Amino acid sequence: MTTPDRLLQLRQQLQKASYAYYVLDAPVMEDSVYDQLYRELQRLEAENPELITPDSPTQRVGEQPASQFRSVAHNIPLYSLENAFNVQELQQWQERWQRIAPTIEKAEYVCELKIDGSAIALTYENGLLVRGVTRGDGTTGEEISQNIKTIRSIPVKLNLDNPPPTVEVRGEAFLPLEEFNRINHEREAQGESLFANPRNAAAGTLRQLDPKIVHQRRLQFFAYTLHLPGQEDKIQSQWQALEYLKKAGFMVNPHCQLCKGLDEVVAYFEDWEGARQRLPYMTDGVVVKINQYPLQRELGFTQKFPRWAIALKYPAEETPTVVKAIEVNVGRTGAVTPLAVMEPVQLAGTTVQRATLHNQDRIQELDIRVGDTVIIRKAGEIIPEVVRVMTELRPENTTPYIFPSHCPACGSPLVRPLEEAVIRCVNSSCSAILQGSLIHWASRNALDIQGLGEKVVITLLENRLVNSVADLYGLQVEQLLGLERFAQKSAEKLIAAIEVSKSQPWSRILFGLGIRHVGQVNAKLLSQQFPTVEKLSQASIPDLEGVYGIGPEIAEAVVNWFRNPGNQQLIQDLEELGLVLANQGIDQTKTDSGKLKGKTFVLTGTLPNLSRLEAQELIEQSGGKVTSSVSTKTDYVLLGDKPGSKAAKAESLGIKLLSEAEFLQLLEP
């Protein structure tokens, strides 16, 4: 594709996306995709300035507003913000404004969380709200005053004794995550399409023709910009403006911070990059503003951006890339998982080349093909996944992907059990299943065998030294010498680590066996109720379902596992090799075990695996107790995702915060 053709394609794609976003409130492109395409357009135009056209998105502020509401011109334009995607680009921004104002040796910065919502402009006359307008294209928006007045965090009357004749306030209307989830649940129950994210939901809500619907959806508003026409000298800094807004009755984000230099800005950004998951609303970066208004006025604006502010964005959690191949992976349970092999991209701070496609149904639903441009997403610690195929960019002559009918590792026919989405290899001798079983057995949360990672497991299998996890305990140093990665010392260390693993507790061994649906938490629950492998192997489905947290699917999987003759032989082999498949000297069904005796816990947030009841059960079974509020008598706060104020109070009191993994380690015998 020639450069002029690529420029034309980029302009058309960005204009279409901009129109859908600003006018229709129906985005067709993720922010990270738009950013990437926009930066490519900027680069190509900088390299080929003769090809710049007046209608290019780089030469415009936005699109025309929709016609459903009355159009209103903004007295002062609502500019976009320039984006920085790393600290280096932030430093370059500072260098640029310093060249414009060389006499300024040092500036203060105000850092504000970049709320993922919808910008609106409010006008007050003599203290009363007279108009609310959407951002629109930055110069003209839509009047939505009736809807604005339903937002409780926006004052209808300013809390000022002698308000100025005119006050203009800008800020972000947004939906808290809890409210967003409630709305989507209601829409799902009514058969309506779901909002893709809280920002889309906020924008769509503001443009509802019926104010009653807006009122029901409980939007909130953070104010961040103040204009006092005719009284500009009254406020001399952004920090002073925020204080004024709070005094006037507006909600200002409580996490704003005044920074003395760029180092403090970077520290603020890094702190919130990790802590933002605790917030009850979405944020995708930090807005950095020069604090001093005189310096802001000296720097002024470009055609699109204020020179005195920039948005420092968090690493993308969604980004586009191209599919190079589709492979399938056979796991330790025989599950066959398709993976997309892609052009390497940066995603959430890491380089990503593979993403899960989950199963055959998902491939068919996406109609993903080799050569497609796709959007991949990464949330938390999970493996990246493909969430959308950009079919508008699909090359010609692509063909649908055909799922394999035979196992790529052993050649056995693949089967799809009834009522399951996962296709499986059911050959118990499959090399891929054995490899996954060995890796799982040695993993940190199971037997924790140091030095026995994937590459070593592959080496052992290729040299036919092991055929089950039991074979690990018969390995000798002499067998390892001469193999790739092994010398005398490394061989001795691995054999010693395998020997040490024999003393791991029953719950870890149970988890390491790899029974379907029996994760770390369920293994802990089962080991407490059935303190020996004999008792567990003899348990019926009703016995297992009687354990708190164990449902019929898990119970059936456990019973079926112990009925398998090969698994019965494995248990016998492990016991003969010296592993103790029982709780050693401790009856963990009794609360006098003392592991947490006398300890007081408070639970907050959503845990990755445990429910609150399960966590409380484990604490009480181990002699501890759970209370509802944090005090000086609290020993631990068990912290999940999106915790409330309890986490902050615990930190202020110096109380230890525990993740779920750290909590489970406390329960280890």
Swiss-Prot record:
Which reaction is the catalytic activity of this chain?
NAD(+) + (deoxyribonucleotide)n-3'-hydroxyl + 5'-phospho-(deoxyribonucleotide)m = (deoxyribonucleotide)n+m + AMP + beta-nicotinamide D-nucleotide
- EC code(s) of this entry: 6.5.1.2
Q: Which residues form the active site?
A: K114 (n6-amp-lysine intermediate)
Q: Which positions are annotated as binding NAD(+)?
A: D31, S32, V33, Y34, D35, S80, L81, E112, R135, E172, K289, K313
UniProt: Zn(2+) binding residues: C407, C410, C425, C430
Q: Which cofactor does it need?
A: Mg(2+); Mn(2+)
Q: Which cysteines are joined by disulfide bonds?
A: none
Listed under GO cellular component are: cytosol
Which NCBIfam families would you find in this protein's record? dnlj, PRK07956.1
Hey, which family's this protein in? Answer: Belongs to the NAD-dependent DNA ligase family. LigA subfamily.
The name under which this protein is listed is DNA ligase
Whose protein is this, by species?
A: Synechocystis sp. (strain ATCC 27184 / PCC 6803 / Kazusa)
